[in-house]
UniProtKB/Swiss-Prot annotation:
It comes from Oryza sativa subsp. indica. Residues 1-13 have a biased composition (Low complexity). This is GDT1-like protein 1, chloroplastic. It is found in: Plastid, Chloroplast membrane. One of its GO terms (molecular function) is manganese ion transmembrane transporter activity. Belongs to the GDT1 family. InterPro entries: GDT1-like.
Length: 341
């Protein structure tokens, strides 16, 4: 009886035990997201009882995809932006703005630097006109002029022109570089006079132009035939040592090289060399280079085509008067600019 009673009690208590047992929790349903066909969607849900994220991946095979751009209830599903995405977007926008600002600043700096080196259009035109007139009338009747004329009488005119103009072009570039270097040194180490910065380079350039103008006018006014023919005699002496007949490619190259060396040595330290330095120190270097090259080209062309015929139309004394007057005129213009500045 005791065993039957105990089994009865155990049987009666079993349903009560099952009723009080709690069922295991069901995992939350993963919401569907709008996705494109063939693409998988990643959903991050926090795991119950921990801070870690459980990543589950739902593919298109689990069910038919919903129409793109719609969520539950037919509404439009807008993409969610987290803090990291917003930060990256702001950083990218700031980087683009900074890059554009730096490019504009760099372009402005380069423009200012080029304007300081080259000068504006007004300075270029003034430098071109000054250099052309000064070099042209300085080279007419000069030693280089007679060298080109005498060489052209014995060789091909085109070959002599190439050698002569090449040497004068190199000499012009060297003169302009020296003049601009002196100009920049004066800007780095300014000389103060009366509380203001005094342009030493412009003043020395004006003094150099005055010197050559006065000496040229004195030589023209003296009327000394020996002084007037000195340049031609020196040219004949230099040409007497010249070799080459300009025939053939090798001989033509040798003639051009010999002419280049001869004219370069004769032009080094000449009045046109120092006058170009003076103009480059006070004017636009681009205008001075262009004007000097144009003046050398025209004067050399006249010498090659018929330098001996120049005396029949224009005497050396008149050329000297014109050249000396131009030297003094450009010196006066430079001094006026110094006073006005």
């Amino acid at each position: 009886m005791a065993s039957v009673a105990s089994s009865t009690v155990f049987a009666s208590s079993l349903p009560h035990h099952r009723a009080t047992t709690r069922a295991p929790p069901t995992p939350p349903r993963i919401p569907r997201r709008a996705r494109l066909p063939g693409r998988s969607v990643v959903s991050c849900l926090p795991k119950r009882g921990s801070e870690k994220l459980v990543v589950t991946r739902a593919s298109d095979e689990e069910g038919p995809p919903e129409p793109a751009g719609q969520g539950r209830g037919g509404g439009r599903a807008w993409p969610s932006l987290d803090a990291s995405s917003c930060g990256l977007a702001l950083a990218a926008a700031a980087g683009v703005l900074m890059l554009q600002g730096s490019q504009q600043a760099l372009a402005g700096t380069e423009f200012m630097g080029m304007q300081d080196v080259v000068g504006d259009l007004g300075d270029i035109s003034t430098g071109f006109a000054s250099a052309f007139l000064l070099i042209f009338f300085s080279e007419l009747g000069d030693r280089t002029f007679f060298i080109a004329a005498l060489l052209a009488a014995r060789n091909s005119g085109a070959i002599i022109f190439l050698g002569t103009f090449g040497a004068l072009a190199v000499m012009t570039i060297i003169s302009v570089v020296l003049g601009r270097a002196f100009h920049y040194v004066d800007g780095i180490i300014p000389f103060s006079f009366g509380g203001t910065d005094f342009p030493v380079d412009d003043f020395l350039a004006a003094c150099l132009l005055v010197y050559y103008g006065v000496t040229t006018l004195l030589d023209a006014a003296s009327g000394d035939e020996e002084k007037m023919n000195e340049e031609q005699e020196e040219a004949e002496l230099a040409v007497s040592k010249f070799l080459g007949n300009g025939a053939g490619i090798i001989s033509a190259a040798s003639t051009i090289a010999s002419t280049f060396v001869l004219v370069f040595i004769a032009e080094w330290g000449d009045k046109s060399f120092f006058s170009t330095i003076a103009l480059a120190a006070a004017s636009s270097p681009l205008g001075v280079i262009a004007g000097s090259l144009a003046g050398h080209a025209v004067a050399t062309l006249i010498a090659v085509l018929g330098g001996s015929l120049l005396g029949t139309f224009l005497s050396e004394k008149i050329v000297a008067y014109i050249g000396g007057s131009l030297f003094l005129a450009f010196a006066a213009v430079t001094l006026v600019e110094i006073v006005n500045s």
